[in-house]
């Protein structure tokens, strides 16, 4: 190969010796021997003689048809670290929309330790500024606090102003805040209005201040108190106020009731104390309850358990009234605190339950997925097994052209399937199945390039490459290359569902069944209650539901079967006859059977009398008695029974005897 390359270089040099021009980069790239492409002859052109491939000169090999070329896996392909845009040649991580969205999430939706550090630092700065504002009102620290506060105010105004502009710009990542009107909608939010007021107030304070002092006049001191609104800057999303509002809304009825009754107690206690103490004079000679307003002030201070002690009842009547109403009113004024405390506790418990429930969602989804995969593994559809099939990675090179300049522009293109390719393997987390194949040592080079339709070759002309065939190997993956280097048998990947053997399918079924049991165990662990009180509540709720179901079942049984007759009185039995229950029907059937038994006994007695009358000759005096008994028995029977005349059979001798 080196001699051929040298001759080619010498030939090109002899043609251009007159100009003494150096070979261009294109010519060097064309004539250089490639270590990544090695030609493989077609099956029809293979010969058993070892010298058949060496006898051909470069011209004859150039005239041959195309040969398949296998990529040498000496240099494994490397994945790009940063994903590039599909339509641009740059990273979308640094695009405008991405930066805008990340900034908006960082400022408006803080999550993570970085956001926590930033917002906590802002809170500390605002708190320090508020402390210096308080110190500026003290005469001892007035000078020092004012000088430090001037520079702190300048820094904070610049910081909050810049942050407000950045917030306004980053809000454009959301559809409802796009454009001028969208930004105006964002600026009309309550927290944005507070930020704007804080920035404007700080600018006014700094501009109007004189001699380097922030608080020059009383008007500026009034504006300075607007800086307290900076403390609201910490809670951007208003989660604190939403939580408080939700608790108050849930317990609104209880709060309104307690406040209403407490207010009534305050009014009545203040009025009665005023009536008892309006003429009383203390030791200094002044009236402490000279008006109803003084009595109301005393009532508010008393029922709220503050007790300043500036107004005290002087008479025993007033003290008695005050003590009685205080016990009643204080109890109602203390109830809202307990109601709100219990509401916050229930809210925290509800959030914990929600977190516990959210942990069950992935476990339930995994259980459903694994159970469905176990069910799908039992059928023989090809879609069930496609996820275990690896599509071949194909490399293509453009067809050769007579022009040398165009041949340099040929590049290989990586083509992967989106569903079963290399990129989707990480998301599916499904291993690729390989199988063994036996080839001869002499034919390994050719068989490895055409295993069950596995096409990883690049078709290119031998005349252009013009290199000797060397050791060939598959360009499947880096792990396969290592296995091939170590001398282990090469496993070709499964590229079609038909190549899956029964052992593969059984293995997949076993793995899926194991995954199902693991997912089931995780779901059962996620379903376990996290507190003993929840266990008690769960058991009590289950017991209550069981009792309700038992009562419902008993009601339905009583409605369908009826109550047992042994527990019913005669009057209840008579009332139960008209009902269409199974018990009432059984009672009526029993009565019918008793009646039928009586009728059958009567019929049997009548038949016995008839048989005895036909066989014997009873005494004439007893015959009318017997006939009367039969007639009486017949009369006592139901009207539907046959009469005595129908049952009586006349004898033949009586028929033949003439009438006297």
UniProtKB/Swiss-Prot annotation:
It is a multi-pass membrane protein. Residues 403-415 have a biased composition (Basic residues). One of its GO terms (biological process) is intestinal absorption. Residues 293-313 dip into the membrane without crossing it. The keyword 4Fe-4S does not apply. Expressed only in rectal gland and heart. Faintly expressed in intestine. Undetectable in kidney, brain, testis, liver and gills. A 1,2-diacyl-sn-glycero-3-phospho-(1D-myo-inositol-4,5-bisphosphate) binds at residue 237. Keywords: Calmodulin-binding, Cell membrane, Coiled coil, Cytoplasmic vesicle, Endoplasmic reticulum, Ion channel, Ion transport, Membrane, Potassium, Potassium channel, Potassium transport, Transmembrane, Transmembrane helix, Transport, Voltage-gated channel. Residues 1-113, 170-185, 236-253, 342-660 are cytoplasmic. Disulfide bonds: none annotated. The chain crosses the membrane at residues 114-135, 147-169, 186-211, 220-235, 254-276, 316-341. Each channel subunit contains six transmembrane segments (S1-S6) with S1-S4 forming one voltage sensing domain (VSD) and S5-S6 contributing to form one quarter of an interlocking pore-forming domain (PD). Tetramer. Heterotetramer with KCNE1; targets to the membrane raft. Interacts (via C-terminus) with CALM; forms a heterotetramer in a calcium-independent manner. Interacts with KCNE2; form a heterooligomer complex that targets to the membrane raft and leading to currents with an apparently instantaneous activation, a rapid deactivation process and a linear current-voltage relationship and decreases the amplitude of the outward current. PANTHER family: POTASSIUM VOLTAGE-GATED CHANNEL SUBFAMILY KQT MEMBER 1, POTASSIUM VOLTAGE-GATED CHANNEL SUBFAMILY KQT MEMBER 4. This is Potassium voltage-gated channel subfamily KQT member 1.
């Amino acid at each position: 190969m080196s001699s051929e390359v040298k001759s080619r270089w010498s030939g090109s040099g002899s043609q251009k010796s007159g100009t003494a021009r150096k070979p261009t980069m294109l010519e060097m790239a064309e004539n250089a021997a490639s270590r990544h492409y090695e030609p493989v002859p077609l099956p029809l052109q293979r010969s058993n003689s070892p010298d058949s491939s060496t006898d051909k000169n470069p011209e004859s090999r150039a005239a041959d048809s195309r040969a398949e070329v296998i990529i040498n896996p000496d240099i494994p392909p490397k994945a790009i670290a940063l994903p590039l845009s599909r339509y641009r040649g740059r990273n979308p991580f640094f695009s405008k929309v991405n930066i805008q969205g990340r900034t908006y999430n960082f400022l408006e939706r803080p999550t993570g330790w970085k956001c926590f550090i930033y917002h906590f630092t802002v809170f500390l700065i605002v708190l320090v500024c508020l402390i210096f504002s308080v110190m500026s009102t003290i005469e001892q620290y007035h000078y020092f606090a004012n000088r430090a506060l001037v520079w702190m105010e300048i820094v904070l105004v610049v910081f909050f102003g810049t942050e407000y502009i950045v917030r306004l710009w980053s809000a454009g990542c959301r559809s409802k805040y796009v454009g001028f009107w969208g930004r105006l909608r964002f600026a009309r939010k309550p927290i944005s209005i507070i930020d704007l007021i804080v920035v404007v107030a700080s600018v006014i304070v700094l501009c109007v201040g004189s001699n380097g002092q922030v608080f020059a006049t009383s008007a500026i001191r009034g504006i300075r108190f607007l800086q307290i609104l900076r403390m609201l800057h910490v809670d951007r999303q208003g989660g604190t106020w939403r939580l408080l509002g939700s608790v108050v809304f849930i317990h609104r009825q209880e709060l309104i009731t307690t406040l209403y009754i407490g207010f009534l107690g305050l009014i009545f206690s203040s009025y009665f104390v005023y009536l008892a103490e309006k003429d009383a004079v203390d030791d200094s000679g002044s009236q402490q309850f000279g008006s109803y307003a003084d009595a109301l002030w005393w009532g508010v201070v008393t029922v709220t358990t503050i007790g300043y002690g500036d107004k005290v009842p002087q008479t025993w009547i007033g003290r008695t009234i005050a003590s009685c109403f205080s016990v009643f009113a204080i109890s109602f004024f203390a109830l809202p605190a307990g109601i709100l405390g219990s509401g916050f506790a229930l809210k925290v418990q509800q959030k914990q339950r929600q977190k516990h429930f959210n942990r069950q969602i992935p476990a339930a989804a995994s259980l459903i997925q694994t159970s469905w995969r176990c069910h799908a593994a039992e059928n023989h559809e090809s879609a069930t097994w496609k996820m275990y099939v690896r599509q071949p990675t194909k490399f293509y090179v453009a067809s050769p052209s007579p022009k040398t300049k165009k041949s340099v522009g040929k590049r290989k293109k990586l083509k992967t399937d989106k569903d079963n390719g290399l990129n989707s393997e990480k998301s599916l987390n499904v291993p690729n199945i390989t199988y063994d194949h036996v080839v001869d040592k002499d034919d390994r080079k050719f068989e490895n390039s055409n295993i069950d339709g596995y096409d990883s070759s690049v078709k290119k002309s031998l005349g252009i490459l013009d290199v000797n065939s060397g050791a060939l190997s598959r360009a499947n993956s880096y792990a396969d290359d290592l296995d091939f280097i170590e001398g282990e048998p090469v496993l070709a990947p499964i590229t079609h569902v038909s190549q899956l053997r029964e052992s593969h399918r059984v293995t997949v079924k076993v793995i899926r069944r194991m995954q199902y049991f693991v997912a089931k165990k995780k779901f059962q662990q996620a379903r376990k209650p996290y507190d003993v009180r929840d266990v008690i509540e769960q058991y009590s709720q289950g017991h209550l539901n069981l009792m309700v179901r038992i009562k419902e079942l008993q009601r339905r049984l009583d409605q369908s079967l009826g109550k047992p007759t042994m527990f019913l009185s005669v009057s209840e039995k008579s009332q139960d006859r008209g009902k269409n229950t199974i018990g009432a029907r059984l009672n009526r059937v029993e009565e019918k059977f008793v009646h039928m038994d009586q009728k059958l006994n009567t019929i049997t007695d009548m038949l016995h009398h008839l048989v005895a009358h036909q066989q014997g000759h009873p005494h004439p005096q007893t015959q009318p008695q017997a006939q009367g008994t039969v007639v009486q028995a017949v009369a006592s029977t139901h009207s539907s029974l046959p009469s005595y005349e129908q049952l009586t059979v006349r004898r033949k001798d009586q028929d033949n005897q003439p009438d006297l």
